[in-house]
Amino acid sequence: MTSRYEVVIGLEVHVQLTTQTKIFCNCSIAFGNQPNSQTCPVCLGLPGALPVLNRKVVEYAIKTGLATNCSIAPRSIFARKNYFYPDLPKGYQISQFELPICEHGRLDIDVDGTSKSIGITRIHMEEDAGKLLHDDGDTSRVDLNRACTPLMEIVSEPDMRSSDEAIAYLKKLHQIVVYLGVCDGNLEEGSFRCDANVSIRPWGQKEFGTRAELKNINSFRFIKQAIDYEIERQADILDDGGTVVQETRLFDTASGTTRSMRSKEEAHDYRYFPDPDLVPLIVSDDWVEQIRRELPELPEAKIARFVGELGIPQYDAEVLAADRAMAEYYDSLVKAHGNAKLCANWVMGELQRALNDSGAGIAECPVTPPMLAGILQRIDDNTISNKIAKTVFDAMWQSGKDADTIIEEQGLKQVTDTGAIEAVIDEVLAANPSQVEEYRGGKDKLMGFFVGQVMRATKGKANPKTLNELLKKKLTGE
């Protein structure tokens, strides 16, 4: 039974950076081009080709380190990680080992209302390997377009005790790197992928159990499935009196199981040593402070401001802050209109619905914050009702016209003349005498029927507040 054991999880996250070129050469990192069309002597590992470090990669690493509460090393070193694999043309990977650029950070997560701090051991820069393409037969081909693509590896402490905590940490980290603009966050294309180190130990035991490493999983759902399966697998082995083997395992998405890939290597197996072709990286305090000043407002700070300064509920704040572009849209809308809660309702409601229906992102939204603010202002001054406002919004989405033009062209201005509304009410009540008697006999739910009839007669233009007040007076005889 897994309840007999404490779960210990540490994560290694590989983040592909959104630079235009590779980490040590000027080749493009664009995804999906012809195999081996984005290569040069450096990323092909040809003799005599020398690497030159991409400054933007360093900036992105520092930015991520600051956002995850890390210390930035004033001096760091690139090292050669030696191993043989067909997609590694040099026979080694340029990475960082003893002196990474960022260390000793943390991320705070929340699981079921409980907060927890997860330590970050280190963040280091490295190059990606190429990609093996397997044919239907018994041959494989190598595409080296991905070789030398810039990566950050973010290594956590083994502080997570469940798959839920692991997923909360990953989602928080994913949100941060996308917010910073250092990664596009595309899991399907491998821009954000994870290795999970999973072990279990009897409750109360201080020593860690033997861990298995689950490799290159690129879906939050699959990561959770893989961790949960691995916990059960190890518990079954220990319950049967067996010994867990330290190894690397692959997750099979079809069966929902993990299978052994190879024995797990230790650091000494890679024979790390400083890369003689790259000088030590020196990072000045001034450079770090310049990057710190350029950091965007991060999700936690944004949520706190939305709740504390704008007064919207915590749930609304979390939804709006989840995406940086959406949060910036909301901020602009509040500045243009002022009513933070009404703005939140419209962004999370009608705007999100239209985006979902069209498949567009917020960057392609045809309704700008000032345009949407124009609709909300016409709700405020009773020119249109909330229901009519949705019609105006749909027309605005299609035409790009402002609210006043749409209201005027389509004759959508709300009827507020009490005399006109009263006349329609009289007609509706006269046409439905039996329903009037039932209402007066205690069937209060019929109020909705009468409101609907009046709205139908006025084509939805009757002011709802005025309509309800007049209708109630007519029906009760007050």
Swiss-Prot record:
Query: Which HAMAP family is this protein grouped with?
Result: GatB
Return the Gene3D superfamilies for the record. Answer: 1.10.10.410, GatB domain, N-terminal subdomain
Question: Source gene?
Answer: gatB
The UniProt keywords, alphabetically, are: ATP-binding, Ligase, Nucleotide-binding, Protein biosynthesis
Q: Which GO terms describe its molecular function?
A: asparaginyl-tRNA synthase (glutamine-hydrolyzing) activity; ATP binding; glutaminyl-tRNA synthase (glutamine-hydrolyzing) activity
The species this protein belongs to is Syntrophotalea carbinolica (strain DSM 2380 / NBRC 103641 / GraBd1) (Pelobacter carbinolicus)
List the PANTHER family hit by this protein, alphabetically: GLUTAMYL-TRNA GLN AMIDOTRANSFERASE SUBUNIT B MITOCHONDRIAL AND PROKARYOTIC PET112-RELATED (PTHR11659), GLUTAMYL-TRNA(GLN) AMIDOTRANSFERASE SUBUNIT B, MITOCHONDRIAL (PTHR11659:SF0)
Q: Which Pfam family, any one of them, does this sequence belong to?
A: GatB_N
Query: What does the annotation say about its assembly with partners?
Result: Heterotrimer of A, B and C subunits.
InterPro entries under this entry?
Asn/Gln-tRNA_amidoTrfase_suB/E (IPR017959), Asn/Gln-tRNA_Trfase_suB/E_cat (IPR006075), Asn/Gln_amidotransferase (IPR018027), Asn/Gln_tRNA_amidoTrase-B-like (IPR003789), GatB (IPR004413), GatB_C_1 (IPR042114), GatB_Yqey_C_2 (IPR023168), Gln-tRNA_amidoTrfase_suB_CS (IPR017958)
EC number, UniProt record: 6.3.5.-
Stated family = Belongs to the GatB/GatE family. GatB subfamily.
The protein's annotated catalytic reaction(s) are: L-glutamyl-tRNA(Gln) + L-glutamine + ATP + H2O = L-glutaminyl-tRNA(Gln) + L-glutamate + ADP + phosphate + H(+); L-aspartyl-tRNA(Asn) + L-glutamine + ATP + H2O = L-asparaginyl-tRNA(Asn) + L-glutamate + ADP + phosphate + 2 H(+)
Name it.
Aspartyl/glutamyl-tRNA(Asn/Gln) amidotransferase subunit B
Q: What does this protein do?
A: Allows the formation of correctly charged Asn-tRNA(Asn) or Gln-tRNA(Gln) through the transamidation of misacylated Asp-tRNA(Asn) or Glu-tRNA(Gln) in organisms which lack either or both of asparaginyl-tRNA or glutaminyl-tRNA synthetases. The reaction takes place in the presence of glutamine and ATP through an activated phospho-Asp-tRNA(Asn) or phospho-Glu-tRNA(Gln).
Matching entries from SMART domains are given as: GatB_Yqey
Gene Ontology terms describing biological process: glutaminyl-tRNAGln biosynthesis via transamidation; translation
